[in-house]
């Protein structure tokens, strides 16, 4: 029952998928991050359904790309994009660490957030349009699962930049050892299946995900002294985009 409640809390927190409502407690949040990747699985399945509709019902290319880019936003309600934009404002302020952390708390949107989100959207849509091979698209769909596995691992492994906020609360209440092990197991199983589906596409995506994870650790440590809830959303976005670019590039080559 506790695991079911943790799953519901995870989907309630990180998606717009309707879930039963109840009062959360610390026990419910202990294993919440274990189920975080499955929101990515839902996104991947919806994208595959959309690809099937595109292939069989005469959907135009531009409609296919636009709706395909919109599906992750619709499922999550833009939760991670909000973190991406706040983080872009903070990183591009070039101010001292304390002021960057203050910018992350600011509810106002800055010019750099808009500019970088526009650039991100164009890059993601361009890469998405290049992923035409069926096996490449299966790997791409699984990337949303992988990005969330890595994001959850970062939450329970990396240093927090501050001692308050949602990320600190979730990391503090999580059973770190069990959550970390569960996420690593899910990540390893997913990658193993993808390597069977298509070795070149899987290797390209795994490299992109690993580089994104490394960059995230180095960048947040340098700029903020650790991670926050906003940077967790930022990581999900950059990891998804990096994997899409890698798959789009390999699709173009082979």
Set out the residue ranges of the language-model regions.
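Glycine/small-residue-rich loop that forms an oxyanion/phosphate-binding "nest" at active or ligand-binding sites
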Residues: 82, 93, 101-102
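Hydrophobic alpha-helical transmembrane segments
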Residues: 1-77, 91, 95-96, 106, ...
